[in-house]
Amino acid sequence: MGAIDKHGYRFEPEFSVISQKGAIHVYKNGDFVEEITFSFNGKFPVVDKIEQLVDEYCHKKGI
């Protein structure tokens, strides 16, 4: 999965299969804002879960 651009923000997911953990790095105008962490099971995180985390973040922050 690649980056998600939404409302002027860029969300770049990355993950480790070994540790079963991931993070979504949030950027605004190229500047790092914060990191959203998550865990998952299997070989890859579910794309829908990443999109849901981004949507929840935007809603919570009023973006």
Predicted regions and their residues:
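N-terminal acidic leader/helix
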Residues: 1-37
